[in-house]
């Protein structure tokens, strides 16, 4: 799996219709109309997200690893 930073994941989510609801410290909280799911994306500069967290966020957002490319 490709290493992805929180910033890159946030851009992907916004392109897929997710909206930034609020910022709590370094965590950006995203939501989507018609969905109760909320995603907390840590934005720590260009530091890559850990694989387990990235997989979890992709699953919750109904995205696949192929969407990262």
For the regions a language model picked out, list residue spans one by one.
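Short, charged/polar, Gly/Pro-enriched secondary-structure boundary elements
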Residues: 35-39
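C-terminal structural segments of small proteins and small subunits
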Residues: 45-69
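Active-site beta-strand termini and strand-to-loop segments that position acidic
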Residues: 30-34
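N-terminal first-folded block
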Residues: 1-24, 29
């Amino acid at each position: 799996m490709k290493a992805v930073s929180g910033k890159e994941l946030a851009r992907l989510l916004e392109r897929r219709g997710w909206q930034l609801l609020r910022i709590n410290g370094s965590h950006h909280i995203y939501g989507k109309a018609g969905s109760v799911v909320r995603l907390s994306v840590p934005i720590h500069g260009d530091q890559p997200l850990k694989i387990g967290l990235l997989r979890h966020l992709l699953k919750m957002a109904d995205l696949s690893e192929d969407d990262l490319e």
